[in-house]
Amino acid sequence: MAMTGRARSMGFSILQKALSSAQRSNAHRSILCPTLSNSELLRNYATASASKEQKIKVPLTMYGVSGNYASALYLAAVKSNTLEKVESELYDLVEASKKSPTFSQFMRDPSVPVDTRVNAIKEICAQAKFGDTTQNFLLILAENGRLKHIDRIVKRFKELTMAHRGEVKATVTTVIPLPADEEKELKATLQEMVGQGKSVQIEQKIDPTILGGLVVEFGQKVFDMSIRTRARQMERFLREPLNF
């Protein structure tokens, strides 16, 4: 059977209230998160819990806006020993945004005032009982207009947490869900490739356009064994001129 994600949901009935509530004062906002450059915010956030701790490094090198924020969050979560909790909370948040058009639009609407965004995030975090690490991170995103990047940031963060646990993701695309025995066999084959010390995690995707067979994306490699690709290869072969 296809691997399905967890279906946890959260209530966001307070969102409308937050959006219509009075804006906070500038003084309040400056206390919550003083005006700093993005690099300063990320640096301060990532090192806030590091007094005299040993230096922690991210397991993967990340680039771009989403990569920088994901790396900063990873460092903060590891130092506060809340990595799994933060990962779970962000998963819940992203899933909730997928199920709520209003919340999703709020996250991506640049016209929403900063104060309104921050108030909404604070109330959402309180209702969902998110921990301090997650809440502080979301407030930074809200302050800097980066909530629209939350999906990409969480995806990059997931890559870091998997690397932290020694997990390697293999994406398997098929027309119908892969039977359990075939998934187990495929996982065993991939596990032999990565060797000991790492664990293969299979993510299944359904794509009827490949017509049949399967496509396996594993690390930097792609094994395309789909009927669609085979048909295209056969078509190219048949179009080639015959030389006798």
Curated annotation (Swiss-Prot):
Gene3D superfamilies: N-terminal domain of the delta subunit of the F1F0-ATP synthase. It is found in: Mitochondrion; Mitochondrion inner membrane. GO terms for cellular component: mitochondrial inner membrane. Its main location: mitochondrion. GO terms for molecular function: proton-transporting ATP synthase activity, rotational mechanism. InterPro entries: ATP_synth_OSCP/delta_N_sf, ATPase_OSCP/d_CS, ATPase_OSCP/dsu. It comes from the Eukaryota. Residues 1-45 form a transit peptide. SUPFAM superfamilies: N-terminal domain of the delta subunit of the F1F0-ATP synthase. Transmembrane segments: none annotated. Keywords: ATP synthesis, Hydrogen ion transport, Ion transport, Membrane, Mitochondrion, Mitochondrion inner membrane, Transit peptide, Transport. Belongs to the ATPase delta chain family. F-type ATPases have 2 components, CF(1) - the catalytic core - and CF(0) - the membrane proton channel. CF(1) has five subunits: alpha(3), beta(3), gamma(1), delta(1), epsilon(1). CF(0) has three main subunits: a, b and c. Mitochondrial membrane ATP synthase (F(1)F(0) ATP synthase or Complex V) produces ATP from ADP in the presence of a proton gradient across the membrane which is generated by electron transport complexes of the respiratory chain. F-type ATPases consist of two structural domains, F(1) - containing the extramembraneous catalytic core and F(0) - containing the membrane proton channel, linked together by a central stalk and a peripheral stalk. During catalysis, ATP synthesis in the catalytic domain of F(1) is coupled via a rotary mechanism of the central stalk subunits to proton translocation. This is ATP synthase subunit O, mitochondrial. It comes from Ipomoea batatas (Sweet potato).
